[in-house]
Amino acid sequence: MHEQYQPLEIETQAQNYWKEHQSFLVRELPDKEKFYCLSMFPYPSGKLHMGHVRNYTIGDVISRYHRMQGRNVLQPMGWDAFGMPAENAAMKNNVAPAAWTYDNIAYMKSQLDSLGLAIDWSREVTTCKPDYYRWEQWLFTRLFEKGVIYRKNGTVNWDPVDQTVLANEQVIDGRGWRSGALIEKREIPMYYFKITAYAEELLESLDNLPGWPEQVKTMQRNWIGKSRGMEIGFPYDQASIGHAGQLKVFTTRPDTLMGATYVAVAAEHPLATQAAQNDPQLQAFIDECKRGGVAEADIATQEKKGMATSLFVEHPLTGDKLPVWVANYVLMNYGEGAVMAVPGHDERDFEFANKYGLPIRQVIAKVEGDDDFESSVWKEWYGAKDESVLTVNSGKYDNLGYQAAFDAIGADLEAKGLGQARTQFRLRDWGISRQRYWGCPIPIIHCEACGDVPVPADQLPVVLPEDVVPDGSGSPLAKMPEFYECSCPKCGQPAKRETDTMDTFVESSWYFARYACPQFEGGMLDRKAADYWLPVDQYIGGIEHAILHLLYARFFHKLMRDEGLVGSDEPFKNLLTQGMVVADTYYRTTANGGKDWFNPADVEVERDAKAKVVGARLKSDGQPVEIGGTEKMSKSKNNGVDPQSMIDQYGADTCRLFMMFASPPDMSLEWSDAGVEGANRFLRRVWRLAHAHVSAGLPGALDVAALDDAQKQVRRAIHLAIRQASQDVGQHHKFNTAIAAVMTLMNVLEKAPNQDAQDRALIQEGLETVVLLLAPITPHICHVLWGQLGHAEAVIDARWPSVDESALVQDTLQLVVQVNGKLRGHIDVAASASREDVEAAARANENVLRFTEGLSIRKVIVVPGKLVNIVAN
């Protein structure tokens, strides 16, 4: 055993052993309890960042711990390999996205291996490979035939110069990010998953996920957005509209119907189109609305604009004429593309009515207090629907609470055939068509005679050609007759293959299930293997995936269940959302007001007595730089630390130890070079103690019955550490406090007596415990030390240590003694001592006698096992 800790040598040795022995290869063992631990798979961007390292280390620690508990553990890894960054990189470097992607995968895989992750690489999936996406296409055809996938027109951002559809984030100030062209809203045919058909189940089954953070479940509940309300029909004013009909609106507040003063429709609504026929100004406004963003977030923050039409509808209860306005905040794809406006009690309508001088009618008032209604100032209570308000100015519906008004107005509307109670969801169907190249081809053939025909199963996969270099204009597949020209599977006539590809969220919605049977060729999933492994016992990923990815994966799991592919209802039993990795930022302001960001490694800092950074200068020129505070590690702020350089300098174990020790996994982790050095120092201490112990020759067995008091204290420290770490790692995932418990134990072992065989046998037990408790966290050093401590089997196959409760029993206890709440000494008493004996010992303590001299003792407070406080005056 080398005297010095040499991480490179140690880590190579451990990794070679795992490779040679296929230590991480796993099979279904029906008689063994399984544990499926999964970290969200990465996009192969080129190299790992610290966020990846943290995510995968957390997963690896949990996996290795459960393996030590005797479970059959699956920890797979793969690549979320389709997507826009590959297309952008391809255009920049003039290389096919496939080649760029596969090169990145090879490099990132070597980085993951260097971290020592216990991954079963035989189950690797790469989503851009046909053997993966063929099953996605197969499921698509099944769902299309059932109507769970359908085609309809959808509104998109269209770049007229690049002839392509842009994602919302690619539209900057209304212009295309690449071409700079003014973006248009366009209606194009798109494919949709009918996720709304599962809205109720997706909402209700959140209650069956006690292992998920409440915050994530709340975010999903809000996104699904179930609301109870009414669909109300406003009869057309035939004099202005020219024919009979109804404008249908959905509202959650029918109790305020008597306050409706106008209605607003979306730019795409048929009434808007009709009104604009002889009104060029209105047509210009409608065109402007259509050019706006299509994202709800954009619409929520943009300035509310509208224009009156010459059309009217009738109030369903009073018959009053209400003007029809076109407004940019009304979405055609929400409800019927129309809203009833009650400016008195809806903040958005209030703002709009004040802007355009529309009537504002109060129909709700506070029950108590003198807070008057003012039509010029919005107050929070205007929108209330609790016991604090009642209806007013509502005729026969006056003096009613929310529910009573809802019911009374609802009953009258239903009687007139102008309303019905309805439950609505905020959730929209999932549009998955993308006019992109680097994605999974949609398996549909368009035939003039037969319509949209799914590609038959025996003709799948529809393979994406991998040698294409996109140029950014239009869809490359739409320019490739060799791809799209085909014959109709139904009638044999010439037909055209669909050239859109699927949203990349589709691939990440079922990958967790394919890991159960990645080589299975008989179907999307091998039901037996899928039911053995699923659901995932522990899923780990960032909170930023709380809604879309996690909701789509839950939806897909239910689709697969309904296809008979899996037996469970939910994909992920427990969810851990790890915090971000943050680091200091430094910058200089440029002449044009921008910022040049400098990497912390290139900056020299000055700290105050509390180690806070108070000054910074660039190493290269010695000139000051501004301190930007701590931010998430990112390329844009240039504050990332390359994991590879850390591994090369300190070794993977140091990197892993720092990551797990610096903060609990669900909190942000602040990068600290000093913290990394501290982690490395600790591992050197462990190595040093083990080296000294092993060099003296391994001891014989420990005789637990023959321990003296000092030895009992050492053994107690060993088993306290086991108890603490078992709770922290196994139950709470608080790896930082588990590591702290091992550090405390190391302090005891370094000071422990080392005189005789019993002492040495005790240190042996202590070192074995240190190695076993650290094995999931720092597996390489523990692999080598376990062998050096005399074990033939590798630590990867060792069991987690169990607590010897008898070692925790103390014959004597040391209690703190206070006088008037101030520490004045310690006393040793028998563990079985009565309260009277403890009080007598405390009163007899020489310090107590000194500090109570001349005082009378009023009372003595005894906290069993901890302290005695003597109150005297």
Curated annotation (Swiss-Prot):
A motif ('KMSKS' region) lies at residues 632-636. Its EC number is 6.1.1.4. One of its GO terms (molecular function) is leucine-tRNA ligase activity. This is Leucine--tRNA ligase. PROSITE patterns: AA_TRNA_LIGASE_I (PS00178). ATP binds at residue 635. Residues 624-643 are annotated as: Disordered. InterPro entries: aa-tRNA-synth_I_CS, aa-tRNA-synth_Ia, Leu-tRNA-ligase, Leu_tRNA-synth_edit, M/V/L/I-tRNA-synth_anticd-bd, Methionyl/Leucyl_tRNA_Synth, Rossmann-like_a/b/a_fold, tRNAsynth_Ia_anticodon-bd.
